[in-house]
Amino acid sequence: MIIKQLSVFLENKTGRLNEVTQLLGNAGINMSAMSLADTSEFGILRMIASEPEKALKILREAEFSVRLTDVICLNSPNEPGALARALNILSGEEVFIEYLYAYSMDNKTANIVLKPDNIQRCIEVLQAHKLELVSASDMYKI
């Protein structure tokens, strides 16, 4: 259930994002989901990669500031209100979501990557409410 996400801190300059994608592509590492957030000084690239430990090593060797973070992925119907229902369940159980990003591959379902404040509690709550979590191995294969 727990997925290793890479968080890469990028200087705000042309080409840095391309360097990351080029390094991982050359190493045969696929990026199945990603989000890029910007601040005035740097960007944060969060991604799920097919081989997170290998990607971490490659990026560190290239002198990127990078770390692994535990996240989970909720498989949800891709329809109005589905995310709100899941978040209502979590907030009702006092589970705080630090951030999330989502993607859809078939327009019927959406995969929502979640970074909760308490990952084990979040998993328990979602499973107790019969919500489907995507396994790490499935995420890494996408």
Please provide the spans of the model-predicted regions.
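A conserved regulatory-domain signal marking ACT and ACT-like small-molecule sensing domains
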Residues: M1-I142
